[in-house]
């Protein structure tokens, strides 16, 4: 088979999206010292994710900053998971799975020059997407009254206990956010006059994903001669991976939006997919401007780096991998119009070997030392048990 180029993306939404029903009281009483402060922390921005340095007990840790997490998360087996247990709660993950999880009281955390006291964290199993982090910082930082600003261009996080610290800064858009299960939702215009309430979720690498049911309602009401989006394909698959497992199989619609509105700002040529979970605006928004939170007035401020109108023109997701029942990498979703589909990849295919070397787990697959520009041979077993070879040259996402 001729060598082709393709894009591979593993969707591993490690966000604990919300705390739907709680057995213990939600903690929004993080105390920051010293008082009356404004601190700047240098952050890492890697593959559309925000990583912050945290230290405690003489050790340094790497935490993901995730506004889609209602509070901090630490992983089973980590020293931090041995902190005193304070309660339990019922947690819902990104794939819609529910589980009762333990909540521990973390020791004081040093973030920049600021010490955070009374942080609570849920204890979760370490998923595929969490292999390179020690924990998650959630939106309880803001819910506890701390103002916060993210500036990816300058690679900095600014945090302050001063009331509405960023209110007087110039911002093109000021939106009221509403808390549902302790995480922030804002209203956007994905197309036409459609108003959609979305989770602003920095734990997601996507720019935008829309609830399938909401899209189907909008599709039924569309004007027969005007549609401010293009359906680029439909298929059956699954792509979201949460702490409790993978989302159920379902229909996925591939979209290209003419213009997505965020307050006074608009984003054109946005590729997106539907999801069985809630609609969300992901961390990729931060490529295009700063985001600040003022908890006193529940405001989100967005200031674009350039003009009010931005052409996103992001790549369409053409293939996503999940884990099968035995932990092996499996094609969860493949775009019918994409290169991987033309190569022969199909939903349900299991990756057994790469260049003759066995692939035993999804974690092994996503950490494979691929070299840019090199052709690889995949041994794939389809759902009917047949094996075949697919050659491709990996193009980084």
Question: Can you annotate each of these PLM segments?
Answer:
Residues 21-397:
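Pepsin/retropepsin-fold aspartyl endopeptidases
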């Amino acid at each position: 088979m001729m060598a082709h180029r393709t894009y591979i993306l593993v969707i591993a939404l490690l966000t604990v999206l919300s705390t739907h029903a709680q057995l213990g009281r939600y903690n929004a009483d993080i105390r920051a010292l010293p008082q009356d402060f404004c601190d700047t922390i240098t952050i890492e921005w890697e593959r559309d994710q925000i990583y912050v340095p945290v230290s405690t007990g003489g050790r340094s840790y790497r935490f993901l900053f995730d506004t889609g997490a209602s509070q901090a998360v630490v992983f089973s087996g980590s020293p931090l998971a041995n902190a005193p247990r304070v309660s339990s709660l019922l947690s819902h993950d990104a794939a819609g799975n529910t589980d009762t999880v333990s909540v521990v009281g973390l020791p004081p955390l040093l973030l920049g020059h600021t010490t955070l006291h009374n942080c609570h964290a849920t204890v979760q199993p370490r998923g595929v997407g969490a292999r390179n982090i020690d924990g998650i910082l959630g939106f309880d930082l803001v819910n506890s009254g701390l103002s916060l600003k993210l500036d990816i261009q300058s690679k900095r996080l600014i945090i302050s206990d001063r009331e509405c610290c960023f209110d007087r800064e110039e911002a093109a858009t000021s939106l009221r956010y509403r808390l549902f299960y302790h995480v922030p939702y804002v209203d956007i215009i994905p197309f036409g006059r459609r108003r959609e309430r979305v989770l602003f979720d920095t734990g997601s690498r996507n720019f935008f994903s829309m609830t399938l049911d909401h899209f189907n309602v909008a599709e039924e009401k569309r004007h027969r001669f005007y549609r401010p989006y293009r359906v680029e394909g439909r298929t059956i698959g699954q792509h979201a991976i949460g702490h409790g497992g993978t989302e159920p199989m379902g229909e996925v619609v591939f979209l290209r939006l003419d213009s997505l509105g965020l307050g006074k700002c608009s984003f054109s040529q946005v590729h997106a997919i539907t999801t069985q979970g809630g609609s969300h605006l992901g961390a990729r928004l931060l490529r295009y401007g700063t985001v600040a939170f003022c908890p006193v007035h529940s405001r989100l401020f967005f200031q674009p780096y350039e003009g009010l109108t931005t052409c996103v023109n992001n790549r369409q997701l053409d293939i996503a991998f999940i884990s099968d029942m035995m932990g092996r990498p499996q094609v969860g979703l493949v775009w019918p119009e994409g290169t991987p589909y033309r190569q022969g990849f199909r939903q349900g295919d299991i990756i057994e070997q790469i260049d003759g070397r066995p692939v035993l787990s999804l974690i092994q697959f996503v950490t494979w030392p691929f070299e840019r520009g090199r052709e690889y041979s995949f041994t794939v077993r389809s759902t009917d048990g047949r094996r075949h070879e697919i050659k491709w040259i990996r193009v980084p996402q």
